[in-house]
UniProtKB/Swiss-Prot annotation:
Phosphoprotein listed as a keyword: no
InterPro entries: PLipase_A2, PLipase_A2_dom_sf
Function recorded in the entry: Snake venom phospholipase A2 (PLA2) that has myotoxic activity but no significant neurotoxicity. PLA2 catalyzes the calcium-dependent hydrolysis of the 2-acyl groups in 3-sn-phosphoglycerides.
One GO term of the biological process aspect: regulation of muscle contraction
Record's GO cellular component terms: extracellular region
Cited Gene3D superfamilies: Phospholipase A2 domain (1.20.90.10)
Reactions that this protein is recorded to catalyse: a 1,2-diacyl-sn-glycero-3-phosphocholine + H2O = a 1-acyl-sn-glycero-3-phosphocholine + a fatty acid + H(+)
Tissue expression per record: Expressed by the venom gland.
UniProt-recorded Gene Ontology molecular function terms: calcium ion binding; phospholipase A2 activity; toxin activity
Protein name: Phospholipase A2 acanmyotoxin-2
Cofactor field: Ca(2+)
Cofactor: how bound: Binds 1 Ca(2+) ion.
Amino acid sequence: NLYQFGGMIGCANKGTRSWLSYVNYGCYCG
């Protein structure tokens, strides 16, 4: 669900130019 990713981009937005990039990878938090 893209809506669920909306809450995950908080950590993904730390080092990425676009949250769409993490939609493909799966939010690499760490």
